[in-house]
Amino acid sequence: MADKDQGPATEWQSAQAAAIGHGAVAAINGGFFTPEGKPLGLVIEEGKRIGTWNSQSSLTSGLLSVEKSPRLLRRQHWRSFSPTRHLLQAGPFLIENSAVVRDLSDRERRPRSFLVWNGRHRWAFGIAEGVTLASLSAALAAQPLSEITITTALNLDGGRSSDLWASPRIPGGPVSTRRIWNTPVRNYLLLLPSR
């Protein structure tokens, strides 16, 4: 997790800049933020709380929580007293228990950023162009990744915020999805190399 204390227009202007600035091999835009540049929900970076807990919006219905190991869970299952190193509220869920999430919007085709997990130790993040939440959920439920069986998928901020970068150290890299029309974002999820 890399959050910009001073808001979206400061520090790293792209996923690539955020990744390089933190020694990461890949990065993707993170959670939603308000027009004033504040996180829409709670963000925790290295134990520091940023923003406030949001229990209302579907855009914060799930979270990535990193305690001893990372996991995706619904906001009602996280406890504020947990020793959380990193946390990002985002949403909605696209896949839960290896199944499509019902009642997702089938309107607004746009770029979507997402995070997937196999429920154990395998993770991936990606961007899909011109899809609805419902169509992305269906596509992910079809298990398109040969190296990971997706049990859980979480929608991240998308649209003009969608920005993924992978270095040449990643198989298939380098990759950058940044477009001229991208807007600065509040935070990024980072993939750090194994130590």
Report residues per predicted region:
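Gly/Ser/Thr/Pro-rich low-complexity, intrinsically disordered segments
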Residues: 1-195
